[in-house]
């Protein structure tokens, strides 16, 4: 594993922190395909995305996990800003960097993500033809999720209050050195509305997977950008790359994987359902993760 810093040309002056996971027998004099792995909203490269990158490397693939702009060990202020457009652009910035590495075959770059990172990956692939194959795990279209709720039970118009809240947060931020925030996962166990989101609390705030660089919240000023965002915008026209979707049969978020499958223009697309798994199961529970990695490794090895 190699730690690298990735300067970006995104107009934000940000440097991304990343970890390259190398397969056994890696030889820098040869060329390899590589998989970019994007982390969930609120996560960091040492959590789910790093686990998938590590396991892909164990399957013989070169993989890179990175921290989003404003998060983890990457630079940028304000900290914990969740700008969906920058999150998607981060993926292309990593691809920029990969094209400079002599051991990367620039014609064989794939990308995958977990949770919101999956939605951002789909969006990056819509906009960046250098991404030749796309994988998603427990996909979340963050705009849909905030507008329509975890299980798609809320109408778009009811999300107007979030835009109002985010707008007011900007005014508050302008007057204070301490920025307004809100949770990306329940901050306390008692705040979780169901078992699946209780697991999100457990993942981010207990020894199960907590990390000091992943506080579990975002800036409230991000809300207006998120509410109007569609990670799958124009997927029915431009998402033509091979697409492998992985989701749990018990995931409340599964409808967002279904939507991606329906909307993607790709003629080579499929969904693999993992029996008994919920959204969070695919972050770190070994039997489920191993099944997901097996599917994704086969997919990337055959498409790149």
Across the structure, where does each feature detected by a protein language model lie?
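Short beta-strand/loop motif that positions the catalytic acidic residue
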Residues: 238-239, 245-247
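N-terminal cap/lid segment of alpha/beta-hydrolase-fold proteins
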Residues: 1-30
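Catalytic histidine-centered segment of alpha/beta-hydrolase-like enzymes
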Residues: 277-290
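Alpha/beta-hydrolase fold nucleophile elbow
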Residues: 102-115
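Alpha/beta-hydrolase-fold enzymes
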Residues: 122-203
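Alpha/beta-hydrolase active-site loop
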Residues: 48, 81-102
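The serine-hydrolase catalytic nucleophile loop
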Residues: 42-54, 68, 257
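Conserved alpha/beta-hydrolase
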Residues: 55-75
């Amino acid at each position: 594993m190699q730690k690298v810093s990735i300067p970006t040309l995104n107009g934000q002056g940000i440097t991304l922190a990343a970890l390259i996971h190398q397969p056994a027998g890696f030889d820098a004099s040869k060329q390899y395909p590589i998989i970019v792995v994007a982390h969930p909203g609120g996560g960091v490269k040492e959590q789910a995305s790093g686990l998938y990158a590590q396991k892909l490397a164990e399957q013989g693939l070169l993989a890179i996990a990175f921290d989003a702009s404003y998060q983890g060990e990457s630079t940028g202020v304000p900290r914990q800003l969740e700008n969906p457009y920058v999150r998607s652009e981060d993926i292309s910035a990593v691809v920029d960097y990969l094209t400079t590495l002599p051991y990367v075959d620039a014609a064989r770059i794939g990308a995958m993500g977990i949770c919101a990172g999956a939605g951002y990956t789909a969006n990056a692939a819509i906009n960046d033809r250098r991404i030749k194959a796309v994988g998603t795990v427990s996909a979340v279209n963050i705009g849909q999720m905030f507008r329509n709720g975890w299980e798609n039970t809320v109408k778009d118009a009811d999300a107007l209050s979030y835009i109002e809240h985010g707008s007011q947060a900007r005014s508050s931020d302008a007057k204070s050195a301490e920025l307004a925030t809100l949770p990306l996962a329940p901050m306390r166990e008692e705040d979780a509305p169901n078992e699946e989101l209780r697991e999100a609390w457990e993942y981010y705030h207990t020894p199960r997977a907590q990390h000091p660089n992943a506080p579990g919240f975002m800036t409230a000023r991000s809300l207006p950008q998120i509410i109007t965002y569609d990670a799958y915008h124009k997927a029915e026209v431009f998402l033509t790359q091979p697409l492998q979707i992985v989701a749990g049969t018990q995931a409340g978020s599964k409808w967002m994987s279904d939507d991606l499958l329906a909307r993607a223009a790709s003629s080579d697309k499929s969904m693999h359902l993992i029996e008994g798994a919920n959204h969070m199961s695919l972050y770190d529970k070994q039997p489920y993760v191993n099944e997901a990695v097996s599917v994704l490794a086969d997919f990337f090895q055959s498409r790149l």
